[in-house]
């Protein structure tokens, strides 16, 4: 019989070994995981068992079906294995991915760098000695590991040639992998959690074609491999830190290295391996390895796993192993690309918290101070008491199911919101649109919570559009994202709404419609009424400090269709709730914010939030529309530490409400009556409704028409300006109107400067200025001078309002004919006739009048009054040369002296001295620097009117003793004067 023919291939064995090594580097068909140090090495059982008797004995101890012993030894005892539960599992099939979970073998005390070189030698039959063989410590370390594993070719490396004794299988720690050590989302039965078992192709595994020849790590890009090789060469010099000396036969040398000679890991479970310290009354537990302090002992024990070799949290996508689960979670995010940090303003998601913080600072104007933290005694950080959590941490999806890209399609069943697993705001775009499930509307929330289905941290009440199902898919339309605003009272809702949406396809994320903001309102009867009418609230009516939306907020995968609405209609973006924040103490949730709530004296939002008050707010909308069009459509950035609201003038309030105190509001019946009073003259509307520029409000005094009610009220304030009683101690709110061109000036000085222009234009020149004191109780003003009420210039508060108990005030109160009104400077008419029943208002005074002044001697000492008295004509010449623009106010208080010398300087018949203490402290600076001097008689050369003043100076009444008060704060009780700010 001829011998059988044979076909031999000498290159078959190297080719198979080469393919096995490539599969190992790619992670294909690997059924065992070796952990050395902090690195995970995937490998094949058959290759390890064929190359090392150590691995053969260790793998036989945990094999599913025990094999008969090869050398006649007894089978390992079941007590020595920790994988008894896997003995009943069926053998692995021939598929690329076996149904049984891979084994995990931990090699305590084995350095990762040396084991990587040994594993590369097992799969490639080649070994690159560190440093070209010159690094004796590294070569000796590899030789010691080769003798420990029983690899004959590596036993001769280094000094000594001790024979290898296979250790007992119990010395190797084998563990059944739990959920943390499985593959990406693998269960014990071989399927995915929450999904059917899906066979994965080799393309789904990460491809790493560039392995490191020293440690076996593989890289995607060759540049990263070059960088790693440079670090790997430098790290090879420090491999002798495992307790191996440079030479010798002692316990520290490589000759006597065995399992007992290698350094044992530090155990934190056998005894207290920490130091207790007391710092400032706080007990701190300090780690003995890294000296990191912790407040509780449980935190230290949890931290101790970092320093031990028990690294039981391997990465599901690479070879790294972590001591704590959160370390692995943060690391796996870079593999999966999950965006877990979600912005509560625009629902944008980010991979890291730092990217989120940068986004909020750049796009939403969030102050970094709100997100700051404070140091704790143990060296960590804790949030401040008033720190706001402006992000939401989404659950990690890859931990429960394999990571899918959005191109793989949507799940079969529609996703419905759950109380424990929130649905992300941005859904994957699929060819088949999802049908959102509409849950039952729950009760409105007005609390701050951190666990709810909406993609927001702070919960607010349901809005009209959100309750109708206009929200994004997964939110249920019941809740919305959050906006931070200030603590202010609510404001009534407006009647103006969004225009009806056109039946066009949804707008792009960059269109203005997708970036509109709908203010949230409480779900109640008023909201239900608006929904029945098919209306949406108008954005921008409530001036809230909202965050700018970045991109399309409503750009979800499914079509946001609501109940009772067609799918083709353009839905408004999901509403943003409003959160008021009181910095420093607490966060308060409000339903409505208004720009006029910060202005006292106007309507209360709580009183007029009902639906019946909505009809009464329509007349102010045209004016506000014009203001909004001028200001632009940009949202104001949120700055919690700054106020965007300027204080409103006291005279800007409504004339009907000015009589009430500032802090109180009129009753509701009065508000309705006043509003209806403004609407007594209805405008004629055209077929298309009244236009924006139509004037339908007319003044009852001058019949001038105005387009808005607000302008009419401001105009009527000019008619009755300064006639109402202002609060004691507050600055007067009088506005000064020019009698020639009806220009309204805020201050008397501005009115005087404006009046000089008319004085130049008039041919008659400047009229003779006259001082007159109005008398409120005796007589009324003639009808021919009815329009001169705004021309009055209120100089200061009357002496009766001071309440200081001065003698002049007491004399004024005792006299019935005393004038309790403010002195008025005016001119243009004849002085009052003697014996008349009332005062006739004189013409307007064109120049500032300084009644009394005091000079100061610089050498007489500080604060001492100088010589008071009239100034001669020389001062008047100086005034005419300098002009009225250089007249200044006297900066400091000084005493006023009244006597015959003072009264003789005035060409008027003063029958009452009650108003004399009120004066403008206007002085003329001295050219020589000797102080300020009064200039009244020299400036105004008044002609003596025979009807008003006698030829001789009148006999003044007995002078009132006025003691000079001491100079101090709050002690000017007997003397009144008007400061500079009181004129305006």
UniProtKB/Swiss-Prot annotation:
Protein name in UniProt: Zinc finger and BTB domain-containing protein 4
Molecular function as annotated in GO: DNA-binding transcription factor activity, RNA polymerase II-specific; DNA-binding transcription repressor activity, RNA polymerase II-specific; methyl-CpG binding; methyl-CpNpG binding; protein homodimerization activity; protein kinase binding; RNA polymerase II cis-regulatory region sequence-specific DNA binding; RNA polymerase II transcription regulatory region sequence-specific DNA binding
Gly residues bias spans: 242-255, 467-477, 552-565
Gene3D superfamilies in UniProt: Classic Zinc Finger, Potassium Channel Kv1.1, Chain A
SMART domains, per the entry: BTB, ZnF_C2H2
Native source organism of the sequence: Rattus norvegicus
Amino acid composition bias (Acidic residues), ranges on this chain: 604-627
Primary site of residence: nucleus
Compartment list: Nucleus; Chromosome
Complex formation: Interacts with HIPK2. Interacts with CBFA2T3. Interacts with ZBTB38.
InterPro entries given in the database record: BTB/POZ_dom, SKP1/BTB/POZ_sf, Znf_C2H2_sf, Znf_C2H2_type, ZnFinger_BTB_dom_contain
Highest taxon listed in the record's lineage: Eukaryota
Zn finger region (C2H2-type): 210-232, 285-307, 313-335, 341-364, 697-719, 736-758
Region feature Disordered, mapped onto this chain: 71-104, 172-210, 227-262, 461-575, 593-696, 713-734, 756-836, 853-876, 947-984
Modified residue annotations for Phosphothreonine: 766, 768, 955
